[in-house]
Amino acid sequence: MENLLELLRTRRSIRSFKETQISPELVEQLMHAVLMSPSSKRSNPWQFIIVEEPGMLKSLSECKKYGCQLIDGAALAVVVIADPECSNVWIEDVSIASFILHLEAEDLGLGSCWVQVRERQTADGKDSEAVVRHLLDIPENLRVESIVAIGVKNEVKKPFDETRLQWEKVHIGKFGQTK
C-alpha cells in the first residue's frame, strides 16, 4: 500500500483504457475495499453492481449526454446505487464509497473515472437514472448515484500539481483568516 498523499497525487481520472480484462481477484479486492467504506451510523445504504459484459458496458456508455462514452472502453463498470430509506445522507455515503473505489483502483495500478448519473439526462432528454435503472433491473426504491469505470490505463497523466493547491480556501478559526 502506498502512502495516502502519494495516492492522492497520482490518482487521476482515466478516460482511456487498454482492452485488457481485470482478474476476478482484483475485482474482489476492489469490492473488499469499497465494502469497508464508512457511512453515517454504519447504515451502509450503498450497493454495487459490477458490469463486465461488453454489450451492457456499451449501453451504459449512452446513459447521459456527455462524459460517459469512456464506459464502453472500460474493463468493468461499478454502478453505485443506494437505498435512501437507510440513511438521509445516502448521497454522501455513496460518494465516500465511490472515492474509496477510486483510491483502491489506483493502489492496484488500475485507472478509474467517475460518471455522474443522478440529476443527469441522456442526449434525448431522458432521465439518466431511469435509463440505468431499466438496463440493470434496479428496483424503483433504490437510487443510482454514479458509475465508476475501471480498467487498465491506456494513458499516462502527470501527478497532481501541488503548486495549484488553493490554500486561500483554508480558513483558520474563522472565515477569512488564513495562513
What annotation goes with each model-predicted range?
Residues 1-179:
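Acidic, surface-exposed loops and disordered segments
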